[in-house]
Amino acid sequence: QIQLVQSGPELKKPGETVKISCKASGYTFTNYGMNWVKQAPGKGLRWMGLINTYTGEPTYADDFKDRFAFSLETSASTAFLQINNLKDEDMATYFCARKGIYYDYVWFFDVWGAGTTVTVSS
């Protein structure tokens, strides 16, 4: 079946770097863009941006342009989110989500990972 499997929870100190993986299976990886979504505790979902899985070109939302990097290992059907110089406000659950369906001028994310929780604590 189609699924996105994310790496496990992370505990990091402020200033460190974290890299989260999202492994796709059950479909052709390069046919669908991959989005990243942040959910801080008690907050709603925030779209961070996406990476074109065919060209490798990333697009970042305005608030996620500085310390965040999307990358791919296409041969392993895996997308990555790296966060550098971690801050307290980065403590959240991060989801990968496949860009799947375009309807009525809106893109819908049709397959989601289970999420990776990042805890930032000194």
Model-assigned labels for residue ranges:
Residues 1-122:
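Extracellular domains of the immunoglobulin superfamily
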